[in-house]
A protein has these predicted regions:
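Select subsegments of transmembrane alpha-helices in polytopic membrane proteins
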Residues: 64-76, 127-135, 333-343
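Membrane-interface helix-loop junction between the first two transmembrane segments
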Residues: 35-56
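Membrane-interfacial loop-to-helix junctions in multi-pass inner-membrane proteins
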Residues: 90-98, 117-131
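Juxtamembrane helix-capping/reentrant segments at transmembrane boundaries
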Residues: 54-67, 119-128, 323, 328
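Alpha-helical transmembrane segments
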Residues: 2-41, 79-106, 139, 145-160, ...
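Alpha-helical transmembrane segments and immediately membrane-proximal extracytoplasmic
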Residues: 52-69, 92-93, 211, 221-225
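Membrane-interfacial helix termini and the short, flexible loops that connect transmembrane helices
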Residues: 44, 113-121, 260
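Membrane interface segments of multi-pass transport proteins and intramembrane proteases
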Residues: 115-124, 156-167
Length: 361
């Protein structure tokens, strides 16, 4: 809305500045979550939307029973309102990301709501994957019919994150890749969201770094210098990601140990999906596993645990996801969380480093 008004009033021309709007997006979304947090938590308590705790989980988690969940609604609402207020809504990429976000949010919300009204298992896993695949189909259709970079050979290529060399995989290959990326990021963040503040801070770090990459990709000179594939309008995604970062930081205020609220699937599936969608738009599909190393580690620990038990009848870890394994090794929850944050920051710096290394190797 502000961007729209700036086009009609010369006095508001300064509102078109991407730097100013990025700052405003961060502040506005942060304040929305911060000030709406307390009444929202009270509302969830009244409605008795509280977390259920696994009986076989660490004993320290039993005290978390009844902690309000579905906090992702607050994050999504803040990002949506901020984006509608500050983003350039004529930008196709912003509209694509907003639609994707709402679709992921719908999956998560239905899953959370069913846990309280129908079954503790929530939405069936196959249905979740089917709905996520539908979002993937929409993203693929955008690439196929509209395109990103204006070069189909690049749009349907996998980009080496270090050398920037494109590997053409075709439309079918890209369809498969998109499904893997979206299902992977969305569900990996969901798996990680098992300790107070564990998932939200890595998400903040990832969205911040992706915001920097989005700005570089949407800048003609910087994208050329850094061997990124220039995409018209992608710089606007840095404003959107600033809103995600601000909302995440505001949520961390209430989600840090001891948590007053949890994201629930509404939040974790959505923020993971957002990272995946924007990674695809920026042609950074292979940068995502580096940037989101902790999410990959958590997801792999579950896959290995299940696979090992089915094939050998033995477990690799004391409990999966791996953050529970560390807890059962008597490492305090807060220490596990902080170490995972540190690891995410390190891999985030490495991910940024690969951008700078492009063209050297």
């Amino acid at each position: 809305m502000l961007y729209f008004l700036a086009g009609y009033f010369a006095e508001l021309e300064f509102l078109k500045s991407i730097y100013l709007r990025t700052f405003l997006a961060f502040v506005v979304s942060f304040c929305i979550v911060l000030f709406a947090g307390k009444p929202f938590i009270k509302y969830l308590k009244v409605k008795k939307f509280g977390e259920e705790i696994r009986d076989d989980g660490p004993s320290s988690h039993f005290s978390k029973k009844g902690t309000p969940t579905m906090g992702g609604v607050l994050i999504i609402a803040a990002v949506l309102l901020t984006s509608l207020l500050i983003n350039d809504l004529a930008n196709r990429l912003i509209l694509l990301v907003l639609i994707s976000m709402l679709m992921f949010a719908a999956i998560g919300f239905i899953d959370d709501y069913r846990k309280f009204t129908v079954s503790k298992k929530g939405l069936a896993g196959k249905k979740k994957l089917l709905f996520q695949a539908t979002i993937g189909l929409m993203i693929w259709a955008y690439l196929y019919y509209i395109g990103l970079t204006g070069r189909p050979m690049i749009d349907f290529s996998l980009i080496n994150p270090i050398s920037a060399h494109p590997y053409y995989i075709g439309a079918i290959g890209m369809f498969i890749l998109i499904q893997i990326v979206l299902m992977g990021t969305s569900n990996a963040v969901n798996i990680t969201d098992g300790l107070d503040g564990l998932a939200i801070m890595p998400m903040i770090i990832c969205s911040t770094i992706l915001g920097v990459v989005a700005y570089f990709t949407g800048h003609t000179e910087l994208s050329s210098h850094l061997h990124l594939f220039y995409t018209v309008g992608s710089g606007e995604l840095s404003v959107f990601l600033a809103a995600v970062t601000g909302a995440g930081l505001g949520f961390l205020w209430y989600n840090c140990y001891p948590a007053q609220i949890f994201m629930g699937d509404t939040g974790s599936l959505t923020v993971g999906g957002i990272l995946g969608v924007i990674g695809i738009i920026l042609k950074q599909e292979l940068l995502l596993p580096i940037l989101g190393f902790i999410f990959v580690l958590e997801a792999l620990s579950v896959i290995l645990q299940v696979g090992s038990f089915k094939l050998r009848g033995k477990r690799i870890f004391k409990m999966a996801p791996i953050h529970h394994h560390f807890e059962l090794m008597n490492i305090p929850e807060s220490k596990v969380t902080l170490r995972f944050w540190i690891a995410t920051l390190i891999f985030g710096i490495i991910a940024l480093g690969t951008i700078k290394m492009r063209g050297i190797l």
